[in-house]
Amino acid sequence: MASSWPPLELQSSNQSQLFPQNATACDNAPEAWDLLHRVLPTFIISICFFGLLGNLFVLLVFLLPRRQLNVAEIYLANLAASDLVFVLGLPFWAENIWNQFNWPFGALLCRVINGVIKANLFISIFLVVAISQDRYRVLVHPMASRRQQRRRQARVTCVLIWVVGGLLSIPTFLLRSIQAVPDLNITACILLLPHEAWHFARIVELNILGFLLPLAAIVFFNYHILASLRTREEVSRTRCGGRKDSKTTALILTLVVAFLVCWAPYHFFAFLEFLFQVQAVRGCFWEDFIDLGLQLANFFAFTNSSLNPVIYVFVGRLFRTKVWELYKQCTPKSLAPISSSHRKEIFQLFWRN
């Protein structure tokens, strides 16, 4: 796989494998690569722009009011902080692709940017698991723990998630380097794996620890959450004919589906990449298919960081309440001639789905 270097990982364990002498033998899609070089940077900058604004706004809404965060807000604020750090590194990769993978920023940023990307992969999914687990405890086992205990556990959990995410990104930080590629006349930021066994370790870390195991936990928690909500909805309809918790149900489904849609393609192509490395699949078709697929899947997964403010916050009622509280706190009374009750009605109509 000579023509591309996906931001998260590299495909080869040594430079001779990465850049064979007949590097253009499988260059069967030059038009596709030219299109990617033109389109992807704009796409990445758009993700950075909206992700920066969205996650900054989320953090401001959570942190500006001078009161203690509840459990859900602790997790969501950490998720926004992780995504904010991540999107700050995207302009570097946009410039890298504009230059056709010629890395102009030096060895240190090569390591730091890719380490941040790798850490975000784990931190985000682990936070999704933590959010699902907390909601599972609240809705399925409401008497299992008290609110103060849950808040303390949420803080500890978030610290551990950041530490674990940082530790799992250490190999990327240590093994990333810039290498000259004379055949292509570029200096690339690449990950050189020192031994063939690292390919297996990488797929275990990336696909199993970073996707399949968290996905199993998310499915387990959300299945029981949805079952509990359906039971409550049936009871509610029987007693008062109303629909309750429909917003929560929709939010949970949105979380799971959005995560799968954004990240499943990347892990699929990462697994195909592993099969190519162990020569389970061969040929130019698979090389070009995996190279191009990884590029697209990488940055499609990145959209999750700009969607998180919408998916995890704006879809739910929690954030709407926080925005309203912040609005009342920051709006001078002299600038509010209408009554607070009318203002609240207008605000509720504005946010009504």
Curated annotation (Swiss-Prot):
The keyword Glycoprotein applies. It comes from Homo sapiens (Human). This is B1 bradykinin receptor. The keyword Transferase does not apply. GO terms for molecular function: bradykinin receptor activity; peptide binding. It is found in: Cell membrane. A lipid is attached at residue 330 (S-palmitoyl cysteine). GO terms for cellular component: endoplasmic reticulum; plasma membrane.
